A protein has these predicted regions:
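Outer-membrane beta-barrel translocator domains and adjoining extracellular loop/strand segments
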Residues: 38-46, 88-96, 138-148, 189-196
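Surface-exposed strand-loop-strand hairpins of Gram-negative outer-membrane beta-barrel proteins
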Residues: 32-63, 151-157
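Short sequence motifs at beta-strands and strand-loop junctions characteristic
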Residues: 55-61, 104-109, 120, 152-159, ...
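Predominantly the C-terminal beta-signal and adjacent terminal strand-loop region
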Residues: 86, 90, 170-223
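Extracellular loop and loop/strand-boundary signature of outer-membrane beta-barrel proteins
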Residues: 48-54, 95-103, 145-152, 201-207
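Gram-negative (and chloroplast) outer-membrane scaffold detector with strong preference
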Residues: 21-23, 30-34, 65-142, 168, ...
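Cleavable N-terminal export/targeting peptides
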Residues: 1-23
């Protein structure tokens, strides 16, 4: 993730010399997100019976920082970094119904987003947005009690985002955004169990596919 951030910063710096300086903007956003862990039934718990669902969603507040450029015809292009956020999800099995897996997934993203603005008047506009980028996911957790830990693991996945919203510009150079977007962050898994299970094997692993539905409020300032 550090290398990707550095590479993106270099691209933006290099491109800045060829673009009009007064078309750049910076943005700060706060979001309320519902994180969802899909496909937890793909977790490896051999010989432990059928999958038992637990908590597969978690609501959390987070934030992001963005640097963008205003293009002709009401298009915008930006690089956005979403700050790290950890969420915990649970699942179990019929043979050990009280020994739940507690799957902690720490996520952060670096996205390139495109926006199309549709002005309604001098101050209000609506927009649609789509983005592609990188999601860095780290999985860890435990089973039954915190002493029964899994090894941690991490993945870098292709992430995508789709959304819409409304913008209000109270004064020149300042815009306030209210928006919704769906973000798919791909699959993640922990390492194997770092504890002795009933078979005396390291053959268990927590797995999930992570997404989020986000409502955000943002402040944009044009340079």
């Amino acid at each position: 993730m550090k290398h990707v951030l550095t590479f993106t910063a270099l691209i933006l710096t290099a491109s800045g010399s060829a673009l009009a300086a007064d078309n750049f903007y910076g943005a700060v956003r706060i979001n309320s997100a519902n994180y969802k862990a899909h496909d937890m039934d793909s977790s490896a718990r051999p010989g432990l019976g059928q999958f038992v669902p637990g908590d597969d969603s978690h609501r959390a507040t987070g934030g992001s920082l963005a640097l963008g450029y205003q293009l002709p015809s009401d298009w915008r292009l930006e690089a956005e970094y979403t700050l790290p956020r950890s969420n915990e999800f649970t699942s179990g099995s019929t043979r050990f119904p009280t020994s739940f897996n507690h799957h902690s997934i720490r996520s952060q993203r670096l996205m390139i987003n495109a926006y199309k603005d549709f002005p309604l008047n001098a101050q209000f506009s609506v927009y649609g947005t789509a983005g592609l980028g990188l999601a860095h996911l780290q999985s860890s957790g435990w089973q039954g009690n915190p002493n029964r830990q899994y090894f941690s693991d991490s993945q870098n996945n292709l992430a995508y985002a789709l959304g819409f919203g409304v913008s209000y510009s109270p004064i020149q150079k300042v815009s306030i955004d209210l928006g919704y977007r769906y973000v798919g962050m791909g699959k993640t898994h922990s390492g194997a169990n770092n504890f002795t299970n009933v078979r005396g094997l390291q053959d268990e692993q927590m797995r999930a596919k992570l997404s989020s539905s986000e409502i955000s409020v943002g402040l944009r300032y044009s340079f």
